[in-house]
Amino acid sequence: MQIFVKTLTGKTITLEVESSDTIDNVKSKIQDKEGIPPDQQRLIFAGKQLEDGRTLSDYNIQKESTLHLVLRLRGGGKKRKKKVYTTPKKIKHKHKKVKLAVLSYYKVDAEGKVTKLRRECSNPTCGAGVFLANHKDRLYCGKCHSVYKVNA
């Protein structure tokens, strides 16, 4: 029977084979016509690579079927090294929710009078709601950078 082999250049060659012929036998016939050694040949039929020991009938290759010839690529890709991190990743800060935390900013005396424990900045550029930071010997405004001494 006659089969066609489409080569690397796009040229189609015809081979006279039998259905009992092995793929090795077909590759040697291609070598006789094209000069490509069998160990560099890969034959593809219906999207599958043909293995050397099998016959044409194993792959259901019939008369006037077309095989595709491609070259075998030697070697593989270079193995990449895995990244090794020297420092451990920083753990994200978890917000601790404290129930009724706002009560720590106010004081209620025996008569029921509510007073603020934190002082507001008296500078007119800051406005209401800007509190002073308590330090050991002073009060500090983070907005206008004013410092107030505390008499202790």
From Swiss-Prot:
**PROSITE patterns, alphabetically?**
UBIQUITIN_1, UBIQUITIN_2
Residue ranges of every copy of the Ubiquitin-like domain listed in the record: 1-76
Q: Which CDD domains match?
A: Ubl_ubiquitin (cd01803)
Q: What is the effect of changing residue 29 to R?
A: Deficiency in ubiquitin-protein conjugate formation
Is-annotated flag, keyword Lipid metabolism? no
Identify the keywords attached in UniProt to this record, alphabetized. Cytoplasm, Isopeptide bond, Metal-binding, Nucleus, Phosphoprotein, Ribonucleoprotein, Ribosomal protein, Ubl conjugation, Zinc, Zinc-finger
Q: Which superkingdom, per the lineage? A: Eukaryota
Please give the Pfam families that the UniProt record associates with this protein: Ribosomal_S27, ubiquitin
Name of this protein? Ubiquitin-ribosomal protein eS31 fusion protein
- Species name for this entry? Saccharomyces cerevisiae (strain ATCC 204508 / S288c)
